[in-house]
Swiss-Prot record:
The active site is at H383 (charge relay system), D437 (charge relay system), S543 (charge relay system). It holds the Pfam family Trypsin_2. The gene is Fam111a. Its EC number is 3.4.21.-. The modification Phosphoserine is found at S25. This is Serine protease FAM111A. Residues 1-72 are annotated as: Disordered. PANTHER family: SERINE PROTEASE FAM111A, SI:CH1073-475A24.1.
Length: 613
């Protein structure tokens, strides 16, 4: 290309001449038209300059001579991979506040090398000091406090990194225009809310940023890490359980707060939808932590034996397609849909004593059901308490932990009530049993009236017929489920029929134990007189629900269930609850006798309330 042609191109674009004038020392007038001088500078046009720190002033974004240079910020970075190479050493990073986190990190050669070696995997950046949660890679550095410490790891993720490159560009907004807040990685109803399975763990948090004036939905949608439900209107944010924030609200007031996403689930009482191509993304049942289930290996072993037996028997059957139809018709004839008004009145009265129990133990959040036993004492499942405190915590610390993170309300019948409707729990945990799976907690007085206790309504469990569970399945509003009692003598047959029927419908034999863990093997459950078995649609969040007979008598506490999965969903096999008479007898033992006599002495001389109308 001739010098004459190059000169004509430069004079045709005065904007670029202005940039040279702005950023370099003044060139003498007689040299401005010298083509040799222009030729040297023309090799460094902005589109050809590599993104080095010394050359950034030539960015096309910087066109104003009087623009204030962006401030710098220091961040400490640790590469949490390849420990032999990096030896957990800390890297000091100084970067411009207008840079995105991703762009800033890539100025470190160690990070660039690791990104290159981790091709096909997604970078995760988690705040360790100064900022918490997994950070959005597009977050402007101005949102990160000075001196923060972050840790970089990598994971396999289905979403492609290049789809989010729009978030890695520099930002020119003032730091005061941003809002930063955190989201629990596990939802309150819809558990799977993130695309990346590595992040989908209890206790993990996502650090999200947005612009003031922007809606919550737009902010989470642009974040890029949430599942497609974020595009709909059927979700909201919950703050500390007592505050609901709709996704159409602006993010302005969310600064520094922690929230949980509550997304609505498809309504199907018996079969839980599971998206075939998304793993377990849409499961709405609560599966127990593996470390809890692993404590009781006999249940898994018996489950394998039973599945093998059922599979062997089912292979011998020729008319497999008709079996499921016959089973459904038979079950339908056994169960009535109508409920006598008298029963409804009984259940309406006792339902006031059923409570919604919620906890948030440093990010480990969940919910269950409880009910008033006597005065300020409430009853729930022992495995619920184990889930609250977490793995490896000494039992001597349980009382203090639950007193700090557990809340109870009895008014969740339509919308979650406000804070003054919640009871806290005293730092007291003395009465419980792992075998019967029950635990007693004591509420703190808060000026609100505690509903009547159900202690005086304990009666023997019926051997057949209908029973009624009242609770908060999946953390939803209080509801009632009518169940058919499975007699003890029919438990094995019922389980085999259900396994066979679901196999014919396309189910696979990989059982999952929901609601709870259990120390009882399958064989022990079949012959255990301390439990009542039944069919119910109540899944996660219903542990601790009271079970009543048709007279409104308290007969059991809902505890456990066995399910099987198949290609399109999850179905229950059988559920069971601990019989209240067995729990009551256990409380009378020497270990708890003093406590039991104290609470029961208040009613010894009081005539039992009639449960008949």
């Amino acid at each position: 290309m001739s010098c004459k042609k190059r000169k004509s191109q430069i004079s045709f674009n005065p904007r670029k001449n202005k940039k040279i004038k702005d950023y370099f020392s003044q060139v003498p007038k007689e040299e401005q038209n010298d083509p040799n001088t222009v030729k040297v500078d023309s090799k460094k046009m902005p589109r050809d300059i590599t993104n080095t720190r010394d050359q950034r002033p030539l960015s096309p974004r910087k066109t104003r001579q009087d623009q204030t240079p962006p401030l710098n910020k220091k961040i400490t970075v640790t590469l949490g991979v390849n420990s032999r190479k990096h030896k957990n050493m800390k890297y000091e990073l100084t970067c411009r506040e207008t840079s995105s986190l991703y762009a800033a990190l890539n100025t470190l050669s160690a990070v660039r090398e690791e990104v290159e070696s981790q091709k096909g995997r997604e970078m995760l950046v988690c705040g360790k000091e100064g900022i918490e949660g997994y950070l959005n890679l597009g977050m402007p550095v101005c949102c990160i406090p000075e001196g923060s410490h972050v840790v970089i790891t990598f994971c396999q993720c289905k979403s492609k990194t290049q789809e989010n490159k729009q978030f890695f560009e520099s930002q020119d907004q003032a730091s005061t225009n941003y809002v930063r807040f955190c989201i629990h990685a596990v939802g309150s109803k819809r558990k799977k809310i993130l695309k990346c399975g590595e992040l989908q763990k209890e206790g993990n948090k996502l650090c999200v940023y947005g612009f003031k004036g922007e809606t919550i939905r737009d902010t989470l949608r642009k974040d890029g890490r949430f599942c497609t439900f974020i595009e709909s209107d059927d979700w909201k944010l919950i703050n500390d359980l007592d505050t609901i924030i709709e996704n159409t609200q602006p993010v302005d007031e969310l600064e520094g707060k922690l929230f949980q996403v509550a997304a609505e689930l498809p309504k199907n009482p018996r079969v839980v939808s599971v998206t075939q191509n998304s793993g377990s993304e849409n499961r709405n049942f609560h599966k127990l932590e593996e470390y809890i289930v692993n404590e009781y290996t006999t249940l898994k072993e018996e489950g394998k034996k039973l599945r093998a037996y059922i599979k062997e028997k089912s292979e011998k059957r020729k008319k497999k397609a008709s079996l499921f139809k016959v089973h459904k018709e038979h079950f339908g004839k056994m169960t009535r849909n109508s409920t006598p008004v008298k029963v409804v009145k009984h259940l309406s009265r006792v339902s006031d004593s059923v409570g919604f129990l919620w906890w948030n133990n440093n990010g480990n959040a969940g919910c269950a059901t409880c009910f008033v036993f006597k005065e300020l004492y409430i009853l729930t499942c022992q495995h619920v308490i184990a889930s609250i405190v977490g793995e490896g915590i000494d039992s001597s610390e349980w009382a203090n932990i639950i007193s700090q993170c557990v809340k109870v309300t009895f008014d969740y019948e339509e919308l979650l009530p406000t804070g003054d409707k919640f009871f806290m729990v005293k730092p007291w945990f003395e009465i419980s049993d792992k075998h019967l799976d029950y635990a007693v907690l004591e509420l703190k007085e808060n000026g609100q009236e505690v509903p009547a206790g159900l202690y005086h309504r304990i009666r023997p469990v019926p051997h057949s017929g209908l029973i009624y569970i009242i609770g908060h399945p999946e953390g939803e509003k209080k509801s009632i489920d009518c169940c058919t009692v499975v007699p003890q003598s029919s438990r094995r047959k019922k389980c085999q029929e259900n396994f066979q029927a679901r196999e014919e419908a396309g189910f696979c034999f990989s059982t999952s134990f929901i609601h709870m863990y259990t120390q009882r093997s399958f064989q022990e459950m079949l012959h255990n007189s301390d439990v009542v078995t039944y069919d119910t649609s109540f899944f996660g969040g219903s542990s601790g629900s009271p079970v009543f007979d048709s007279n409104g008598s308290l007969v059991a506490m809902h505890a456990a269930g066995i399910t099987c999965t198949y290609q399109a969903g999850v179905s229950n096999i059988i559920e069971f609850g601990s019989i209240m008479e067995s729990i009551d007898d256990h409380m009378k033992q020497d270990k708890y006798k003093e406590w039991y006599n104290t609470i029961s002495g208040n009613v010894q001389n009081v005539e039992m309330l009639s449960i008949d109308f």
